[in-house]
Amino acid sequence: MALDIHAHRILILDFGSQYTQLIARRVREIGVYCELHPFDMDDEAIREFAPKGVILAGGPESVHEANSPRCPQAVFDLGVPVFGICYGMQTMAEQLGGKVAGSELREFGYARVDVVGKSRLLDGIEDHIDADGLFGLDVWMSHGDKVTKLPEDFHILASTPSCPIAGMADDARGYYGVQFHPEVTHTKQGGRILSRFILDICGCEALWTPSKIAEDAIAQVRAQVGTDSVLLGLSGGVDSSVVAALLHKAIGDQLTCVFVDNGLLRLHEGEQVMAMFAENMGVKVIRANAEEQFLNNLEGESDPEKKRKIIGRTFIDVFDAESCKLDNIKYLAQGTIYPDVIESAGAKSGKAHVIKSHHNVGGLPEEMNLKLVEPLRELFKDEVRRLGLELGLPYDMVYRHPFPGPGLGVRILGEVKKEYADILRRADHIFIEELRKADWYHKVSQAFVVFQPVKSVGVVGDGRRYAWVVALRAVETIDFMTARWAHLPYELLETVSGRIINEIEGISRVTYDVSSKPPATIEWE
């Protein structure tokens, strides 16, 4: 009998915290499957999910205000351990008979909590031991309210000077609450705390590993598809590449990929995609060379949103034309990942997930009367990358920097022309090449060059050059929601600038973007 890697599972209820997806990623890293659902999840759905434990996440609301979110009673009726984090601790306390009030001194940022009570959750976990033998933890706080009265059968677990009940525990029922955030890296022992709750208190087994995920996904694809044929739009990005590798391993020649070359790809990208999948892996890949069609459709358009729509619409036209040449296609594969599922569920719906269509294929499944195959829909991006390595894809492909769906079309400011794309491709290649040489490529989260449709005077030898300006962009980020510009060494920037200006005739000036997000976005358009 096949191993059920979903058998040991954790339910995470979302009360609106910016960290909720991070909790889910941390649970998965421990090796346990989990799902994230809105706080008002239906009672019957909770019982059907049958978790071995529940985590109540944080949120921006105040428990003592009218109509603030509450945890479904079904959670406390399950008879499984429950872990409340920040707002989750507060609503647990209030619902079980305790009290919560606004705090005169709010806590945001780093803090030290003293572990003042014995519990299965924190015993043996500490950052400091003071002269009196008191254990301390370095944590991340983000709260304006606090628990002022414990529910019956709870005892104080941790405290700070301004928050005497910074943690609470009822070991008999396996109920715990902490006012800090164990899911963020700022809480040094956060991983150990979550692991203690999930593995020791909930009794979960670490079944969720890349090798087992690959085996399970392959088995599911074979069961769903049978002997039918599957079509995949292969872009060369991480998600579609991992889907291609997974499907090829699962169903072999039943998979056909269409790779649309829109003329807006990185230098040699088309050749690299074909070499990797068609030549090395033996995947059936149709390369549609549509550069002229894309550039003709983009002619004269400078509005960023309109450019995106033109590129998306043209992709569908080309993809549709190629797919119509194929016989007996029954399934369309997409690289939908778990954050897409979460975002598409709708705010606090508590209903079944509605999967977001991939930005490239739009309404194609309905138009072509195809059924969907989405083998990555349970996975976060970091899990997709690890799965890619498990399937044998090269590290440099799996951990390549993000590239926008419209490609260079949104890195060329204003109208898109072949001349601009050719110049930008070469400049971008030089930047990435030098980052790799200097061992900076994997130290930054994303790096690229932007073409600016303005000219600047330069001097080359004894002559005057009037040519284009490009900007280098490199950022560091954890979640791409916020980002800081990367402080690259001046010597590296000098090397990149010198090479670009000397090797590319159409460029006379190179600038470096030192804007962080917010207020700027990572991409320029």
Swiss-Prot record:
It comes from the Bacteria. Signal peptide: none annotated. One of its GO terms (cellular component) is cytosol. InterPro entries: Class_I_gatase-like (IPR029062), GATASE (IPR017926), GMP_synth_C (IPR001674), GMP_synth_GATase (IPR004739), GMP_synthase (IPR022955), GMPS_ATP_PPase_dom (IPR025777), NAD/GMP_synthase (IPR022310), Rossmann-like_a/b/a_fold (IPR014729). GO terms for molecular function: ATP binding; GMP synthase activity. ATP binds at S235, G236, G237, V238, D239, S240, S241. It is an enzyme of class 6 (ligase). Residues 208-400 form the GMPS ATP-PPase domain. The active site is at C86 (nucleophile), H181, E183. Pfam families: GATase (PF00117), GMP_synt_C (PF00958), NAD_synthase (PF02540). Pathway: Purine metabolism; GMP biosynthesis; GMP from XMP (L-Gln route): step 1/1. The keyword ATP-binding applies. The keyword Transmembrane does not apply. Residues 9-207 form the Glutamine amidotransferase type-1 domain. PANTHER family: GMP SYNTHASE [GLUTAMINE-HYDROLYZING], GMP SYNTHASE-RELATED. Catalyzes the synthesis of GMP from XMP. This is GMP synthase [glutamine-hydrolyzing]. It comes from Pseudomonas syringae pv. tomato (strain ATCC BAA-871 / DC3000). The gene is guaA.
